[in-house]
């Protein structure tokens, strides 16, 4: 097991903690990570795009000119796709882009992402992430103290409205509960800032 430092919210080292190799020490599987990120983005799509085919556009019932003798190409409708205001060929219609992945695949991708972060030294463990009041300035100071400036994912063991509201106005900073972390958010962040209790939850849920 690898050992990393545990900091307090002031950035001072207060101890160490061992990371479970079954979660933070595997060889990352990039193909699986790619598939899970693709699945996440597909599931986020609204799927509301819609356009009209030539049969659905209003008008165009009359033949614009006679078949022969005009010098024009033959035309049967002003709503054919090559015309301005004509219908769309294979027009998109509202549909769901979501699809299901095997749970084992998702779990492997999550472990791969966490292992990659651990190998890169981009996991920061804090003994307790707690704030008395909603204060964005204080939360930004905390991130600076633990050297997690920039894109960061702050993970707490349970939902903490004070932390969520303190962090939500800082560009690039996201928050999550330990049991709800996903591969996309982990990879999008430069640093993974874990409450020590959140680390215990992750190891309990995903080991």
What are the functions of these language-model segments?
Residues 1-46, 91-207:
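Extended polybasic, low-complexity segments that bind anionic RNA or targeting/receptor surfaces
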Residues 31-68:
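A short, flexible low-complexity segment enriched in Lys/Arg and Gly/Pro that occurs
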Residues 4, 8, 18, 40, ...:
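Exposed boundary/loop context
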Residues 54-90:
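Glycine/serine-rich anion-binding loops at beta->alpha junctions
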């Amino acid at each position: 097991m690898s050992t990393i430092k545990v900091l307090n919210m002031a950035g001072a080292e207060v101890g160490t903690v061992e990371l479970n190799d079954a979660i933070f020490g595997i060889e990352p599987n990039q193909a699986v990570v790619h598939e899970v990120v693709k699945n996440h983005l597909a599931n986020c799509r609204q799927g509301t795009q819609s356009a009209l085919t030539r049969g659905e556009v209003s008008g165009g019932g009359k033949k614009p000119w006679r078949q022969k003798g005009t010098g024009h190409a033959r035309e049967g409708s002003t709503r054919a796709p090559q015309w301005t205001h004509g219908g769309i060929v294979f027009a998109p219609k509202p549909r769901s882009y979501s699809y299901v992945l095997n749970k084992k695949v998702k779990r492997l991708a999550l472990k791969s992402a966490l292992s990659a972060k651990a190998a890169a030294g981009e996991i920061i463990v804090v003994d307790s992430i707690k704030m008395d009041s909603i204060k964005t300035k204080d939360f930004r100071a905390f991130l600076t103290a633990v050297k997690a400036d920039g894109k960061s994912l702050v993970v707490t063991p349970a939902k903490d409205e004070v932390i969520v509201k303190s962090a939500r106005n800082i560009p690039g900073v996201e928050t999550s509960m330990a049991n709800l972390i996903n591969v996309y958010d982990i990879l999008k962040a430069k640093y993974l800032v874990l409450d020590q209790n959140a680390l215990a939850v992750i190891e309990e849920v995903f080991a």
